[in-house]
Amino acid sequence: MGKIVQQCAAVVLNIALVALCMHMAAAATTTQPGHICHLPGFDQALRCIDVPVPLDYQHAADGNLNLHVTLAPALREAARPDPVFVLAGGPGQAGSDILPLLESGFRKLRATRDIVFIDQRGTGLSGKLDCDSTREVDDLDEAGQVQLIGTCMKSLNKPFRFYNTENSARDLELVRKALGYAQVNLWGGSYGTRLAQAYARLFPAAVRAMVLDGVAAPDQVIFAWGRDAQASLDATFGQCAADPGCSKAYPNLARQFAALLARVNGGEIGLDFYHPRTARRIQMRLAPARFLQTVRTVLYSADNANRLPFLIDSADKGNWNPFVAQMYSTSDFSLEGPALGLMLAVTCAEDIPRITPAMVADEERNSFLAGQEVKLVPKLCRSIDVPAIPASEPGMIAAPALLLSGALDPVTPPHRAESAARHMAHAQQFVVANAGHIVSQSGCAPRLLREFIDRPDQPLAADCLKDIPRNGFQLGAAGPHP
């Protein structure tokens, strides 16, 4: 009986693969531009397209950039005419960096719609603005970071002033036209939600609906996220204290963390380890920036945050190996680091000019991050010298919008989505209690994404998000149970 089932399953799989290949072949012989391609992070054939866009929209004849677009065609032959445009985060992350979402968050959507991943100008395969030399810049002190990044930006020799959110939004419109779509749906994650909102305001007739996951509010200043990070850390410590196993294993967690942070800031932590990916021996003094960014990044994922008490306790007892392994790990769904040049081009023009002395003082007083980034990044901005883009009053967005937030998110928590929703005529907002940054791939969320995109004008029944559990805390080297 089992053998018959296996044979039947193989037949069904072969039929599905043949259908997909026929669909791809049909697409290749019609009006779709580009070519069949295979990219890291997804093992099926995709379609890669280069779309030329003006470097400077004010002087479009002066030269173009090539924008890389990755199209995953709908799996069913009778596809809906409106695709989903995927806008990655950062700023600096590329659409092609998050292709694994095709098998998680977008697996339901792709049944009936093309999924279009766009590498924003200056990211990924769209002329990534980055240098290999900056990969481990957080290991340096502030003066070293400023010098290294300044050298990198000078070597890139790019007109950074043209790499901003508005130009990227205009690029999306040219992609829509090049691919022949009358209207599109948008999925934006983190900074991608800022880009999605900008596009929806500039080209309202082109946007059918949008899903914003990890919502950046119009008034949010990137790098001034100290209070949000502190709230996430406090929530993690609070959940540990309320958990019998975690509180027993780590009864003095907050005190341990404070003592560890003081030692790191005092330059007392020397590390001697083998790099987890290269096996190269490294001897270094742990820089405060590296320590702080590792803790903040761990908080992005609820599962990783469940490891944080173990990491802190191990380090406090002299075993830094678990922390080092986490320090060099990659994100769950991104294959590459962000383009540092693009991140600076956007934030130095759009965010850093909005930082005030009062904001810096607040960051210093009210977060374990102690204002490190809001004090450092303005110095990095001198290396690219982009003009400030004045903040404008956000207009109302007419397209139906689904706003998703993780209650434990250290960078775009639910109150950011609430602020953004005030400028949307038809917004539905949901919070996942046991989640951090980006929730589209969690629990029933993939199904809800499709239900919303299919019927964006209808109320979404999303009670299933309450059923997404939080996994247990790591209580020892073996996992949740010591």
Please give the residue ranges for each predicted region.
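N-terminal secretory signal peptides that target proteins for export/translocation
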Residues: 1-8
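Bacterial N-terminal signal peptides
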Residues: 11-23
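Bacterial Sec-dependent signal peptides at the C-terminal "C-region" and cleavage site
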Residues: 20-32
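Structural motif
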Residues: 275-293, 300-304, 333-341
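Short helix-capping/linker segments at secondary-structure and domain boundaries
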Residues: 299-313, 353-358, 457
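Non-catalytic, charge-rich alpha-helical accessory subdomains
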Residues: 308, 312-324
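Long, low-complexity segments enriched in small/aliphatic residues
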Residues: 319-354
